[in-house]
């Protein structure tokens, strides 16, 4: 029998009659493939790639100057409303896309290995792969069986043949929403219109072959799109279809990426979507209206015959439901292969056999009805190109047709459609409408009876087959409406969405290469295709099929009913590959589905849209490591499934799988087993058992190397129109949401045994969706990105920590901290080196002589002032520097002494200050402060310096200095003129009086010292004053108020001998014998700033150059101008001021500065913040300053200058340490590739001056070994510390045999000593002191010691809505609470999961309560530091007004009444009244 005569449709020849003729030729197909595969070299390397698509959390710094998420009515843009792809630098970032291009060379090797494995496979191995089926017969024209379609080599040739053969036959029909025929074209009309389009495009637009154009048409303009695409094919123009539903950003990206200069559209579309937009203003893009081309005179065109490898179409799929943005390139060969293979499958339908009935319609012409627009790849292939090739008519209907009851059945009956192509979403609308009201279909029109007997195939586009719905369609819609063999008619069609929607498998009746006998073919192809699989085996990635007779042995939830697609289309092969090893899976295993076919388009690098950084994109096929052509390569489809009887079974998308690891005992060993779930089945079960759920999505995130599942569900009960006072039509909304989440969690536990971290409830149809194949589906990738960026529009969130916590490494049962005896014993066992952490003064440092020691103990700073005034009275003592007057001599030594004497006289007469009394110095001008403090020293008055940094922020300082005045019983307050004017203002004065009343104290008197007249008589009286006992070592001469960065205030008392000892250290180790001025006035209330401003210049006899802090912060170049003009060698500047001034500096004379300047000393009271230090280093490089000029120093309230980096720069003192080890109390330097993810610490000093430093265990009080963390203890050589009292850090004896009971002072700060190698000193190890946080700024949880500052900084980066420095974390009564200050009141519920996940992933800490407060609620100092103690006092007292609160651990709810007011936050506006506060601080009973 001739194979050509088989396709003669006038004969009713059965397929099995020609089986013997064809079966002999099947073996050559496999041999040909093996021959091709032997040409490829097999690689025996074990392939293992990180192709998993789980979420990775990465922490990134946001831009400091970026204005994001402001309050409402702001002129700035609210970036939370931007598309998810354009969110600037999300902190927790989904980083899968960056790896796609990097994996392509490896994927090419995997493809090569698959060919080698298939070519060498034997039948005994039972591997899951298929050999391509090849039709060993001519593919003839169904309308003309004597003509072979294989002779046509391009699409235009096919169109010309179809026009010549069937010119008047209907080609395409467009149906509107009401079912009326809008447009109908014949083949002749289509070609004529296409030539008219090509004539205008070539002669008027000037397009040449290879030019890329955009076709911009709406759904209702399908006919115009078809004509345009054929017109472009006539000229060899590359088509890029875009829909007006795409965003303008997508259009701009395509224009820029493809360098498009011309776009075709219609007049209506241009007027609606383009005319008044910014896209129209782009001069590089010209818009042409194709519906006006009929007005142009037709001119002859020069037709271009496209070759096989010429590009025909470039399809951008923007954010399909499961994949990122892709770019598929179609060639002529690709489309011809698709048309030939699809036609060879469709025409083998045995509809003309006995028992099948078919009406005649235009000489048995086939008709396809579909709702897929031709701009979609599937609609273009099946509805346009394959329609031309096979000669059938295509009816394009609107989506509303499927929603109208009875309309689809009417159209199928009217046009006698033989094929239909829909998706599940559209077909469900029609079927369910028929189930609810059959009369609307049966009596849709008078004298009309629905008859679907003409349907041969009802094709349904999907990735996962729904067997339950297939039965409903066949038994309850097709069969009642006249379809015979309805179960055979319903045909799922597998389209690879990763490749833009290319069909790769659907039902056909071609002979399978595996069916060697007639009865085997009939058994495999005509019986029911559904199989029953044990769900437990699928979870273990195995396939265990249950016979239908054994179904009673299992419960319904233990068995999964699955339906296949079919064999791969002709000329295609499928292999199931192991996800880890990349080997072909054996029968009974689940793996990745890899496809080999000429029908697949050429993929360019994916995620072009989501690649804003502009990384180099890799061409999948043009990669140099891919040594074979595309048609010889397997491609990863992104699906997971298996083969059974050579048919494809798909479980779901690889990106949508949810992994779970369970620990089980196997042979007395604890083993971890991997289980895999698929979100498709998970959401389907939840929707089945929880009727309140409309739709949802499930995905996984990775926290601390553990995988957690997150469910985001949509419920119609949450609507803004229904929410009113948290009530839903008489029912409590919260109770309803609790019921939904508990039911959903119960489903995941009972059926899937899946532990869920959190369940989020979103309003109806509010989750991010993407339009794909004509439907709106939830976009999993967008939901992941929105979840990680905290932008999901959820209204309720609930955590299930009890089920999720066992996966983490957190030991909840370990109540002992790192300072316990057991922990100390464990540390000693781990650390092998028995080296004590101790830093001694360098041996070359000279000891203090007895004369010098006697001088320090029996004299004061007043003696040095008198001596200097007597010897060099005309030498400059005080200099000032500003941007206008530059350097200016304010006072000489004689004039300075005279000013001090006049000030003393004023204090005696007006202030009436007595010796040993306390006076608060409240100054903004450093010169006036300098005079006042020396006047206090002369009178024996104890001064308490308090610097006013900004006059405008004085009102924020009132509470602080008022509390200090009460604590020390201050008798008077001395101020300068600017401070006095500010204090006399009505608001500040009333606030000061009210604060004194609240503190139950009498307001101290205020005296202005600016402009005191100079009196020569006062100098004579000053010489008669004898300080008396001021030089006594145990008497207090000064009280320093130290403000730490965390907001803490530490007052410290010093004697004159202590102050002189500090000055001596500065003179010997910093200034030396130089006579150059020293800079002061920047920070003059405490620490080294106080020494350099008020004392060091007098002690060393050098001038003091005063620079105001405000001037320096506003103009950082002022510092370098002062250094250059005065030839300064060493400068002291605090860390925060250094960062601000360096950032504002425009530049400097780097040559002069580097030659003159020796070092800029930056004292740090706390751990140097790495971000600030890095910023300083970057500014140093920008300015041109030598990097070794800036050096860090360790300061403490009890010792302003403990140690410093005398010989090394900041860059050499840094290192990365293991964060987990630091929390455990150990020190471990990370040297691997992951070191950049660990904390970066900068060393605080190597030179200890005259001090001895030890790292001491704070509980056991022994010196720690190297490798441990402990408390920093200091021993001073010069009696630098005062008496021990309640207001001062005290002294404590450290008893150790190796130490002769030396007196050490506790700093209260944690740290360690680590040895670094120095290349310039013969690799000698130098001890470096690294400081951590103060003990009161740490949390001990679950046996770990956490830094509050690190946790707060990490959580601040979670979302831009959180204010800078807007987090406060504290622990009270066993609960960990975090307060967040936010810009705007929106999407709080979406922030909760990512905040909790971030804390758990980065710091292994579990938050118990999260509360949000509006911006401006936190009390702050003028410098911006949070007043932590005052904020906590407001919270515990119930005075802190907050928006809403969320409890994470449900066991912290106190009573039933409290549960009813629990954690619900909606996207509506919040009421700030006390009655509507959801969680009150007093109810938590935290303190």
Curated annotation (Swiss-Prot):
One of its GO terms (biological process) is acetyl-CoA biosynthetic process. Has a role in meiosis. InterPro entries: AMP-bd_C, AMP-bd_C_sf, AMP-dep_synth/lig_dom, ANL_N_sf, Dip2-like_dom, Mug62_dom. GO terms for cellular component: cytoplasm; cytosol; mitochondrion; mitotic spindle pole body. Pfam families: AMP-binding (PF00501), AMP-dom_DIP2-like (PF23024), Mug62 (PF24919). Its main location: cytoplasm. This is Meiotically up-regulated gene 62 protein.
């Amino acid at each position: 029998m001739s194979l050509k005569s088989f396709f003669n449709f006038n004969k009713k020849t059965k397929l099995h009659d020609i089986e013997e003729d064809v079966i002999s030729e099947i073996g050559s197909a496999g041999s040909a493939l093996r021959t091709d595969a032997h040409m490829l070299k097999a690689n025996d390397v074990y392939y293992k790639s990180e192709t998993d698509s789980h979420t990775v959390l990465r922490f990134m710094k946001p831009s400091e100057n970026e204005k994001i998420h402001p309050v409402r009515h702001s002129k700035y843009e609210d970036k939370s409303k931007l598309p998810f792809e354009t969110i600037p630098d999300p902190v927790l970032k989904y980083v899968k896309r960056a790896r796609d291009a990097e994996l392509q060379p490896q994927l090419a090797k995997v493809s090569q290995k698959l060919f080698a494995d298939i070519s060498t496979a034997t039948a005994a191995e039972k591997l899951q792969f298929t050999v391509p089926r090849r039709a060993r017969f001519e593919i003839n024209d169904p309308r003309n069986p004597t003509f072979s379609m294989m002779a046509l080599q391009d699409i235009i040739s096919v169109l010309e043949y179809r026009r010549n053969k069937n010119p008047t036959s209907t080609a395409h029909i467009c149906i509107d929403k009401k079912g009326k025929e809008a447009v109908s074209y014949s083949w002749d009309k289509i070609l004529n219109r296409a030539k008219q389009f090509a004539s205008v495009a070539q002669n008027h637009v000037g397009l040449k072959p290879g030019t890329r154009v955009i076709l911009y048409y709406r759904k209702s303009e399908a006919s115009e799109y078809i004509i345009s695409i054929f017109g472009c094919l006539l000229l060899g123009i590359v088509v890029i279809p875009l829909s007006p539903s795409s965003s303008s950003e997508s259009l701009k990206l395509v224009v820029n990426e493809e360098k498009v200069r011309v776009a075709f559209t219609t007049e209506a579309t241009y007027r609606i979507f383009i005319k008044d937009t910014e896209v129209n203003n782009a001069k590089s893009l010209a818009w042409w209206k194709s519906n006006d081309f009929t007005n142009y005179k037709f001119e002859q065109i020069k037709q271009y015959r496209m070759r096989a490898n010429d590009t025909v179409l470039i399809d951008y799929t923007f954010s399909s439901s499961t994949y990122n943005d892709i770019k598929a390139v179609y060639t002529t060969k690709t489309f011809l292969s698709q048309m030939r293979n699809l036609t060879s499958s469709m025409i083998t339908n045995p509809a003309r056999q006995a028992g099948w009935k078919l009406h005649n319609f235009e000489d048995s012409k086939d008709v396809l009805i579909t709702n897929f627009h031709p701009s979609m790849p599937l609609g273009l292939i099946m509805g346009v190109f394959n329609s031309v090739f096979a000669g059938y008519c295509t009816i394009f209907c609107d989506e509303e047709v499927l929603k109208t009851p009875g309309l689809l059945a009417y159209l199928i009956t009217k046009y006698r459609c033989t094929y239909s192509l829909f998706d599940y979403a559209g077909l469900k609308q029609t079927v369910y409408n028929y189930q609810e009201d059959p009369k609307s279909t049966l009596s849709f029109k008078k004298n009309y009876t629905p008859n679907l007997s003409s349907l041969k195939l009802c094709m349904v586009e999907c990735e996962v087959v729904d067997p339950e719905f297939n039965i409903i369609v066949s038994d309850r819609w097709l069969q009642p409406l006249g379809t015979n063999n309805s179960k055979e008619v319903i045909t799922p069609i597998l389209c690879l969405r990763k490749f833009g929607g290319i069909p790769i498998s659907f039902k056909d009746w071609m002979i399978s290469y595996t069916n060697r006998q007639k009865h085997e073919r009939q058994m495999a192809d005509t019986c029911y295709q559904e199989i029953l699989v044990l769900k437990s085996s699928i979870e273990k990635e195995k396939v265990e099929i249950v016979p239908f007779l054994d179904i009673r042995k299992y419960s319904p939830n233990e068995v999964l009913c699955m339906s296949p697609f079919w064999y791969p289309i002709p000329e295609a092969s499928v292999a199931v590959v192991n996800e880890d090893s990349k080997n072909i899976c054996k029968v009974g295993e689940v793996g990745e589905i890899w496809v080999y076919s000429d029908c697949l388009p050429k993929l360019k690098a994916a995620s072009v849209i989501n690649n804003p950084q502009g990384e180099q994109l890799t061409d999948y096929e043009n990669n140099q490591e891919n040594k074979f052509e595309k048609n010889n390569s397997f491609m990863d489809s992104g699906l997971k499934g298996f083969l059974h009887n050579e048919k494809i079974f798909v479980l779901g998308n690889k990106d949508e799988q949810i992994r779970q690891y369970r620990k089980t005992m196997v042979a007395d060993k604890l083993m971890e087993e991997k289980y895999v779930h698929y979100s498709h089945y998970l959401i389907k079960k939840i929707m089945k058992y929880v009727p309140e759920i409309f739709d949802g999505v499930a995905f996984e995130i990775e926290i601390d190397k553990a995988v957690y599942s997150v469910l985001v569900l949509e419920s119609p009960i949450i609507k803004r129109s229904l929410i009113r006072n948290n009530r839903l039509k008489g029912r409590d909304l919260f109770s309803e949401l609790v019921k939904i989440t508990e039911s959903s969690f119960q489903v995941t536990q009972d059926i899937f045994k899946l532990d869920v971290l959190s369940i989020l409830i979103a309003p109806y149809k509010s989750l991010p969706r993407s339009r794909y194949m004509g439907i709106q589906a939830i976009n999993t990738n967008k939901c992941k990105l929105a979840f990680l960026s905290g932008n999901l529009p959820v209204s309720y969130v609930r955590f299930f920590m009890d089920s999720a916590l066992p996966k983490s490494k957190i030991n909840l049962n370990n109540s002992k901290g790192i300072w316990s005896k057991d922990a100390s014993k464990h540390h000693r066992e781990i650390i092998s080196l028995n080296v004590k952490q101790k830093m001694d003064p360098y041996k070359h440092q000279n000891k203090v002589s007895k004369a010098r020691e006697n001088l320090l103990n029996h004299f004061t700073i007043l003696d040095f002032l008198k001596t200097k005034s007597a010897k060099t009275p005309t030498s400059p003592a005080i200099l000032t520097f500003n941007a206008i007057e530059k350097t200016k001599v304010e006072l000489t030594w004689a004039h300075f002494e005279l000013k001090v004497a006049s000030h003393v006289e004023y204090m005696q007469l007006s202030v009436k200050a007595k010796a040993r009394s306390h006076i608060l110095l409240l100054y903004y001008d450093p010169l006036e402060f300098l005079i006042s403090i020396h006047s206090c020293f002369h009178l024996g008055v104890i001064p308490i310096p308090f610097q006013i940094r900004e006059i405008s922020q004085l009102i924020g300082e009132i509470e602080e200095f008022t509390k200090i005045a009460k604590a020390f019983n201050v008798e008077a307050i001395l101020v300068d003129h600017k401070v006095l004017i500010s204090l006399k203002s009505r608001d500040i004065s009333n606030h000061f009086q009210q604060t004194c009343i609240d503190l139950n104290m009498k307001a101290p008197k205020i005296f202005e010292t600016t402009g005191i007249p100079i009196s020569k008589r006062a100098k004579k009286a000053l010489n008669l004053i004898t300080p008396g006992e001021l030089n006594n070592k145990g008497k207090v001469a000064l009280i320093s108020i130290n403000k730490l960065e965390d907001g803490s205030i530490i007052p410290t008392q010093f004697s004159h001998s202590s102050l002189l000892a500090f000055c001596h250290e500065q003179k010997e180790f910093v200034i030396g014998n130089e006579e150059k001025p020293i800079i002061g006035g920047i920070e003059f209330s405490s620490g080294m700033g106080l020494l350099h401003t008020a004392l060091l210049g007098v002690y060393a006899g050098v001038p003091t150059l005063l620079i105001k802090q405000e001037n320096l912060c506003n103009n950082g170049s002022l510092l370098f101008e002062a250094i250059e003009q005065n030839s300064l060698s060493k400068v002291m500047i605090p860390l925060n001021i250094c960062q601000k001034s360096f950032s504002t500096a425009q530049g400097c004379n780097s040559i002069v500065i580097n030659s003159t300047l020796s070092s800029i000393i930056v004292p740090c009271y706390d751990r140097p913040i790495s971000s600030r230090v890095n910023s300083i280093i970057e500014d140093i490089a920008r300015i041109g300053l030598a990097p070794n000029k800036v050096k860090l120093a360790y300061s403490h309230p009890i010792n302003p200058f403990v140690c410093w980096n005398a010989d090394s720069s900041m860059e050499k003192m840094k290192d990365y340490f293991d964060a987990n080890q630091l929390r455990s109390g150990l020190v471990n330097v990370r040297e691997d590739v992951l070191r950049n993810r660990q904390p970066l610490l900068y060393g605080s000093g190597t030179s200890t001056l005259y001090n001895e430093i030890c790292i001491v265990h704070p509980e056991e009080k022994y010196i720690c070994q190297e490798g441990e963390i402990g408390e920093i203890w200091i021993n001073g050589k010069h009696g630098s510390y005062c008496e021990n009292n309640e207001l001062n850090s005290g002294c404590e004896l450290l008893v150790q045999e190796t130490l002769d009971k030396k007196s050490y002072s506790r700093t209260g700060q944690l740290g360690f000593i680590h040895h670094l190698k120095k290349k310039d000193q013969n690799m000698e190890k130098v001890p470096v002191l690294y400081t951590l946080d103060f003990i009161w700024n740490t949390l001990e949880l679950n046996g770990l010691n956490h830094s509050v500052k690190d946790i707060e900084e990490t959580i601040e980066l979670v979302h831009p809505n959180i204010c800078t420095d807007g987090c406060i974390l504290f622990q009270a009564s066993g609960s960990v609470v975090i307060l967040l200050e936010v810009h705007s009141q929106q999407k709080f519920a979406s922030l909760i999961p990512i905040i909790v996940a971030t804390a758990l992933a980065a710091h292994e800490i579990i938050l118990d309560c999260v509360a949000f407060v509006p911006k401006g609620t936190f009390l702050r100092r003028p410098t911006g530091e949070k007043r932590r103690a005052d904020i906590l006092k407001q919270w515990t007292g119930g005075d802190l007004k907050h928006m809403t609160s969320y409890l994470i651990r449900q066991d912290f709810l106190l009573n039933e009444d409290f549960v009813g007011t629990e954690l619900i936050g909606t996207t509506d506006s919040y009421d700030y009244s006390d009655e509507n506060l959801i969680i009150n601080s007093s109810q938590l009973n935290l303190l």
